[in-house]
Amino acid sequence: MKVNLMKSGFLAASLLLCAAPLTVVAQDMPAGAWAGTWVANSAKSKFPGPAPTMDQVTIEPDGSVAVHVVSADGKTTDWSYKPQAGKSVSIQGRDNTTVEVVKVSDYRNNQIWTHEGKITQTHSTLSKDGKVQTFYGAPGTYRAPGETKAKPFSEVVVYEKQ
């Protein structure tokens, strides 16, 4: 009986040790071909208002995303996040905002954004040659910081890899 308990304990410990790395891998979302620095091409994009003078996204190989935007009126905004598979994560630099990124394929990611309890779904595509990334914002309304009234919101941003 002691031998069976020892074998069972050894088997359980072995399974836990083998499963632990799988849990870590399942949470990571490496960027693959999405990694790099991307700059918006305003001429090919559609913004809800005046186009920003700079819209740059940097995606690290580990999947971390950093966004740098300079609005048409010169205001700078920086925000970032590191997506985790199956998990909504907080966005640094955007209060009360989270995002869950769902990998649909190597060429498409869906995003579920939550801002102050309101949910918005968007998606991004990557061209087969890996040189163009397109972000498709969900139609709806958006209240810009400092504004009291929401405005219609629709956005398609074409980013080119640098």
Region spans (language model):
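Sec/Tat signal peptide C-region and signal peptidase I cleavage site
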Residues: A20-A26
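Bacterial N-terminal signal peptides that target proteins for export
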Residues: M1-A13
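Hydrophobic small-molecule pocket/channel-lining residues, especially in calycin-type beta-barrels
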Residues: Q27-Q162
